[in-house]
């Protein structure tokens, strides 16, 4: 509930008039609920994968009954991250100087909050070129877990463990998928995360080429898709009632009022991808005596209104507050330039009542 009130305060200064420092405190509180320690400043706006757009559009539909299932991957979750590889190219030893590329892959799993339950971590390796364009060659893709490292890097075979080996021939699918859920779970402790080593090399050269002929190794882009569940932000989606459609007739009684939050107005448009804004609404109005059924008053509010009618100076009227809220899904860049899709409860005021 405080999330809606926070935005209302920042946008309707005439009503709330928070000091600048108070506004920063409220912003930090909201950002922390998103797992962010500060306002993200993306170094570059990475393209949003098509799968992420599909999940976002599906999650935004009001017909979805369980917002805590990511049907695209068949697992439970309300947070989806596309993590960027933070590793680098490794200088190959002389014995592999021809037709072989080694790369260190690293994904920072410590960005997950402690409360999050990891459901899936899937490595997606995509080739930037069509393998058919590189000639009739067979490539091997070997993925290793790095067990330990030194200042010189991974220096011995005992320092790594083979996770998967795969061959790719012309016409093969342009991507390789590897389930790393169990390994990624251990990576949540930074001291256990040494990353992985990817080795890509030519297995068979065309008979027309001699042993030391150079064959172009395709560039490869690695991403780790991480799906997790925050149980504190996961409730069954409630269908909006007719009261969601705000009445247009003027009235001073307690009811939802229109409030559209545009993220550009608060300077967040550079890191929030979608939506660009949303209808949050707020509650405002009087709770007059006698309270009608339409004002959704509690027994306590009814009695308080009765006492107020006899002693208006000593007893205030009940307050007009949100009693029913609904969630939204947000797509944004986090502090590590990862693309994140997250489901948030209590973001839209649907109904108000006297309390």
Swiss-Prot record:
GO terms for biological process: axis specification; BMP signaling pathway; convergent extension involved in gastrulation; heart looping; left/right pattern formation; neuron development; nodal signaling pathway; positive regulation of cell division. Transmembrane segments: none annotated. Pfam families: TGF_beta (PF00019), TGFb_propeptide (PF00688). PROSITE patterns: TGF_BETA_1, TGF_BETA_2. Residues 1-15 form the signal peptide. Homodimer. This is Protein DVR-1. The lineage of its organism: Eukaryota, Metazoa, Chordata, Craniata, Vertebrata.
